[in-house]
Amino acid sequence: MPTELQKERELTKFNPKELNYFLEGSQERSEIISNMVEQMQKDPILKVDASYYNLTKDQQREVTAKKIARLSRYFEHEYPDQQAQRLSILGVFDPQVFTRIGVNLGLFVSCVRGNGTNSQFFYWTINKGIDKLRGIYGCFGMTELAHGSNVQGIETTATFDEDTDEFVINTPHIGATKWWIGGAAHSATHCSVYARLKVKGKDYGVKTFVVPLRDSNHDLEPGVTVGDIGAKMGRDGIDNGWIQFSNVRIPRFFMLQKYCKVSRSGEVTMPPSEQLSYSALIGGRVTMMMDSYRMTSRFITIALRYAIHRRQFKKKDTDTIETKLIDYPLHQKRLFPFLAAAYLFSQGALYLEQTMNATNDKLDEAVSAGEKEAIDAAIVESKKLFVASGCLKSTCTWLTAEAIDEARQACGGHGYSSYNGFGKAYSDWVVQCTWEGDNNILAMNVAKPMVRDLLKEPEQKGLVLSSVADLDDPAKLVKAFDHALSGLARDIGAVAEDKGFDITGPSLVLVSKLNAHRFLIDGFFKRITPEWSEVLRPLGFLYADWILTNFGATFLQYGIITPDVSRKISSEHFPALCAKVRPNVVGLTDGFNLTDMMTNAAIGRYDGNVYEHYFETVKALNPPENTKAPYSKALEDMLNRPDLEVRERGEKSEEAAEILSS
């Protein structure tokens, strides 16, 4: 007998596989990813199942190391873009493996590429075999115990010794200890260290250096002290560590010198823009945008599949069957916006990825040619990318955290089971909201240049959304966001002129969020092709309604939307969009092309046999043969203890009282 999910799947009027071509950017890329998924779920070392959720911290570390060793065999046959695609998939079902490799191939390699000369990049990556996970293993040494978001406040020092042509790396005090460094505890042989450049007594600010941590025998280098951070909220498969340096000497050419250079005689050439030193972080933020799409798609798929199967309560006493969760308006209001968000995240991730690659190529070409005009133009593009990636990283990682937990709650008690993935995923995910740019700090930092630019442009103000029909006009929706951003910028500017930007922090975060939503909405509608208009446009409008409602006070404050239209979003427009999306839910979730291994949730399987899979999973991992617990004696002793009078030897009984009082 077909399940509820299978019945609805048969009614889908479009091909989910072709929809996946839209989500992944092309048919070729979609098919490559499908082939990689098939490889990994058939690989006995790489595949995951529900037993993954029972692993201890030590087991996670060991299993992760074995998986990295196995992946190295795949990487030997793949180009960097293929490796990136494989890692992106891994991030869905095994994020700790993805991160443990990503710190090496993402952050370390990106740092060397972004800050090193072509020769340095070739030496530390291709020549060493790092792209094939051979030779050396890198980590990224930016964060310190006392400094994270304020990179310019980093206190590790790199002092030039002109006599020996070396830099001396030191940790001057406990607060300067490198902290949270992924891979440092056990894996990494080298670290891209952010340290203060000191030459002839002058401090030139924070620059980057490649510092060996371990020799070819994997023993620590002299002067290097490393420790394990220990248990964390999530991602225990990653060996995060701390590092201290005591007079560690490295050759002068271990400093990455694409922009800032130090000559043999100690002459320092400074970069055209300090922001260029942080290019590695932009790559990480772009990756997190793709992570947001993939992780949101995973958990909204699980929750919606469960909602199609699960029935609860009857609408009328005369009904013979209970109502599906998904047919309750509240359930749609809770979950459909995150389904829409996954689709918009996909568009944003693809755009950022393409823009970053093009910008990096332009910058590399300009620097190699030594053309100042081209370098300046590339720097402008890099700054735009910094703002866009910062807005999207912060906003979308926040929303993904919300998506995972809202999806969990929408599955009721079953969402709390480890075997349905929500708990581990949430614990693993939320670090994205604080690493590589704490979301609040990052949002404020990228909003400041946005506000300055907006203040240079003519003010945009006035009513935009005057009727419900305006909510179905993408151009007017984008214009509404433009007006909100323009109004906020002027209010922020008026305050900041006297009191500085810090006091406007909440408004700056709001600017960053609204800019991200504007970017996602505008880009999504522009990317929709005619054949997908009927299926996808309702998702875009539904997402816009959700954001207009969540930030309704801002749009009302600046007179951008009338109170009547604002009310009708919730009472008329949003419910009508939900009705359009509802018949397509199975096809839209199937469009993510997630196999059962990738969802790894008993209640979210493709076939919709929710209770059967869930019960069998629980029985398989917790065999019911022996129902007596290892700690049963403690319970038995408690239950079978003598009553209180016996334990008090009858000393407080009436009989004892008579004897003692006579």
UniProtKB/Swiss-Prot annotation:
Homooctamer. GO terms for biological process: fatty acid beta-oxidation using acyl-CoA oxidase; lipid homeostasis. It is found in: Peroxisome. Its cofactor is FAD. Pathway: Lipid metabolism; peroxisomal fatty acid beta-oxidation. This is Acyl-coenzyme A oxidase 5. It comes from the Eukaryota. GO terms for molecular function: acyl-CoA oxidase activity; FAD binding; fatty acid binding. It catalyses: a 2,3-saturated acyl-CoA + O2 = a (2E)-enoyl-CoA + H2O2. It comes from Candida tropicalis (Yeast). SUPFAM superfamilies: Acyl-CoA dehydrogenase C-terminal domain-like, Acyl-CoA dehydrogenase NM domain-like. Residues 642-655 have a biased composition (Basic and acidic residues). Its EC number is 1.3.3.6.
